[in-house]
């Protein structure tokens, strides 16, 4: 079992009005919001999830998660080194090392990249859910920490 220090219980009275769905088979992401008695689709976009390429890349884990943290720029390292490889914009963390974020920007480039033609095709990331940068910003702005549920399924 997982040691208690790594588990943050959610009270049984907690409800979620915002949900993110990631389909790793079809490589897409959707956001839904509970309004009144209905769930409304707020967005649907192509995405790229994690690929199996040990020791640095792994599949996006399947399961139910909660948005836990946000970083406007998530810095990442070059595989196997301590050298900065670049950053992923508008990163919303849903599990240890797993983020929903925009198109990665490899160093030394500093400007954002809106789209990648590989979105919606095959798994390519290290574990994260990569999507268009404008959509990642939407998720980043729209999904409150500890109040947004994330479903990763195949």
Feature map (PLM): residue ranges:
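Exported/periplasmic cell-wall-interacting domains
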Residues: 62, 74-154
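A short, sequence-level motif marking secondary-structure junctions
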Residues: 4-8, 46-53, 104-108
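Glycine-rich catalytic cores of cysteine/serine-nucleophile enzymes that process amide/ester linkages
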Residues: 24-60
């Amino acid at each position: 079992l997982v040691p208690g220090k790594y588990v943050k219980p959610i009270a049984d009275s907690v409800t979620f009005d915002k949900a993110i769905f990631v389909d790793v088979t079809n490589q897409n992401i959707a956001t839904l919001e509970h309004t009144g008695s209905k769930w409304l689709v707020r967005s649907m976009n192509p995405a790229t999830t994690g690929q199996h390429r040990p020791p640095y890349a792994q599949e996006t884990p399947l399961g139910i998660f909660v948005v836990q943290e946000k970083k406007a720029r998530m810095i990442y390292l070059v595989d196997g080194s301590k050298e900065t490889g670049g950053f992923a914009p508008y990163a919303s963390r849903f599990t240890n090392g797993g983020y929903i974020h925009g198109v990665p920007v490899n160093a030394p480039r500093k400007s954002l990249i809106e789209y990648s033609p590989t979105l919606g095709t095959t798994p390519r990331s290290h574990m994260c859910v990569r999507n268009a940068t404008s959509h990642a910003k939407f998720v980043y702005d729209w999904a409150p920490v500890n109040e947004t549920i994330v479903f990763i399924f195949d």
